[in-house]
From Swiss-Prot:
It is an enzyme of class 4 (lyase). It catalyses: (2R,3S)-3-isopropylmalate = (2S)-2-isopropylmalate. The keyword NADP does not apply. Catalyzes the isomerization between 2-isopropylmalate and 3-isopropylmalate, via the formation of 2-isopropylmaleate. Binds 1 [4Fe-4S] cluster per subunit. This is 3-isopropylmalate dehydratase large subunit. It comes from Thiobacillus denitrificans (strain ATCC 25259 / T1). [4Fe-4S] cluster binds at C348, C409, C412. Keywords: 4Fe-4S, Amino-acid biosynthesis, Branched-chain amino acid biosynthesis, Iron, Iron-sulfur, Leucine biosynthesis, Lyase, Metal-binding. Its EC number is 4.2.1.33. One of its GO terms (biological process) is L-leucine biosynthetic process. The keyword Iron applies. Heterodimer of LeuC and LeuD.
Length: 467
């Protein structure tokens, strides 16, 4: 019998019941909750007069609607304020731990989970948010769920799911200078497309993946959803264990030793068979920039905007034509000639300490270009912000003309005060460049933190390797 993939090991460890058609009731170890997808779920509990099955397995934090500027006056927008106040009230009523807006541990849910040791290897992790796949970086099975499923997990600590197919994305070799996990993610999506991972759980492996920090692995797994995958994951190794050790919610003493012994088994067996294998050469990956309105519309910084006539199908050709029209770009324009109005460094993809260090290294001693109206850096959590300030990164950004903000989802999505105006063009370290994602009529280009910082200082895209 062939060995098991990491996905199969994680899945099998959480099976409660299997229906004849394969639909499986899975046990959920960790439930992350935020203010946008939880109000209806809590309301459902109240109407049914149910209590959460395991309030200790849930943790809540407001992130989507919180202001990233001065918080002393609270939240100005009444709808956003109501959502956060509702989360506060629901968590208090049902006994769920919440890192409120005035708590230094508050931040983006997919940053605070790993940071606090709430995300551990071998866990099933869910959240009412697409980018829950981030937590798979720890050798966990993590995926986003809908609001009705949020209620189901609160009530039963279980969830009905169908098993995914398995894909191995193998990146061998060594990344070049200035090339990051974000570039790997965009290169993978450019290769397989935004539907390439549909129906799959993607495991990232190979020498280049093993060489990544946990921050890099989180970036990669965060973007797995943009390839259409249900989940992304990386096998546990010493890098994983070293990151988790000593975190507030991590096990200690004998429990730690027992956990580590199991965690070390969380990798695909040598003879495991995947449904699909995709291979990339790390040395061939260059800094990536998206040019269109889907993460698969991506090219290298040294290339030009493609011509729709080169699209692989008529459907794609029409998509490219529409994208270029929306983005206000002409085919053949060098990527390096694309000028910018705003730059956003943040989001659950790229707002961790390593991301901020990479951006600060580029910004140091430079100034934001005059044509860039706003360049902002939004740390992923209060603790990331605290650490960055202890390292002097905030001064580097402020001296260069960047705004240094409070933690939150910010300009990743047009759900708070940070957004693009119609026609504004932004270099963003977030994960989605859909039409209107950062604001109605806003034009988003996805890049790494270092590329975003370089673009802010140059006023247009530049190859960070030569900057």
């Amino acid at each position: 019998m062939a060995g098991q993939t990491l996905f199969q090991k994680l899945w099998d460890a959480h099976v409660v019941h299997v229906e004849p058609d394969g639909t499986t009731l899975l046990y959920i170890d960790r439930h992350l909750v935020h203010e946008v997808t939880s109000p209806q779920a809590f309301e459902g509990l109240k109407l049914a007069q149910r209590l959460p099955r395991r309030p200790d397995a849930a943790i809540a934090v407001p992130d989507h609607n919180v202001p990233t500027t001065d918080r002393s006056q609270g939240i100005a927008d009444p709808v956003s304020r109501l959502q956060v106040e509702t989360l506060d009230a629901n968590c208090a009523e049902f006994g769920i731990t919440e890192f409120r807006m005035d708590d230094v541990r508050q931040g983006i849910v997919h940053v605070i989970g790993p940071e606090e040791g709430l995300t551990l290897p071998g866990m099933t992790v869910v959240c009412g948010d697409s980018h829950t796949s981030t937590h798979g970086a720890f050798g966990a099975l993590a995926f986003g769920i809908g609001t009705s499923e949020v209620e189901h997990v609160l009530a039963t600590q279980c969830l009905w799911q169908k098993p995914s197919k398995t894909m191995l994305v193998k990146v061998e070799g060594e990344l070049g200078k200035g090339v990051t996990a974000k570039d790997i993610a965009l290169a993978v999506i450019g290769r397989i497309g935004t539907a390439g991972g549909t129906g799959y759980a993607i495991e990232f492996g190979g020498a280049a993946i093993r060489a990544l920090s946990m921050e890099g692995r989180m970036t990669l797994c965060n973007m797995a959803i943009e390839a259409g995958a249900r989940a992304g994951m990386v096998a546990v190794d010493q890098t994983t264990i070293d990151y988790v050790e000593g975190r507030p919610y991590a096990p200690t003493g004998e429990a730690w030793d027992t956990a580590v012994a199991w965690w070390k088994t969380l990798h695909s067996d040598a003879d495991a068979v995947f449904d699909r294998v995709v291979e990339l050469d790390a040395a061939a990956i260059e800094p990536q920039v998206t040019w269109g309105t889907s993460p698969e519309m991506v090219t290298t910084v040294g290339a030009s905007v493609p011509d729709p006539s080169a699209a692989p199908s008529e459907v794609k050709r029409q998509d490219w034509v529409r994208a270029l029209e929306y983005m206000g770009l002409a085919a053949g324009t060098p990527v390096s000639a694309i000028a910018l109005d705003k730059v956003f460094i943040g989001s659950c993809t790229n707002s961790r300490i390593e991301d901020l260090r990479e951006a600060a290294a580029v910004a140091k001693g430079r100034r934001v270009a005059p044509n860039v109206k706003l360049a902002m850096v939004v740390p992923g959590s209060g603790l990331v912000k605290q650490q960055a300030e202890a390292e002097g990164l905030d001064r580097i950004f402020i001296d260069a003309g960047f705004e240094w903000r409070e933690p939150g989802c910010s300009m990743c999505l047009a759900m708070n005060a940070d957004r693009l105006e119609p026609g504004e063009r932004c270099a963003s370290t977030s994960n989605r460049n859909f039409e209107g994602r950062q604001g109605q009529g806003g034009r988003t280009h996805l890049v790494s933190p270092a590329m975003a910082a370089a673009a802010a200082c140059a006023g247009h895209f530049v190859d960070v390797r030569n900057f």
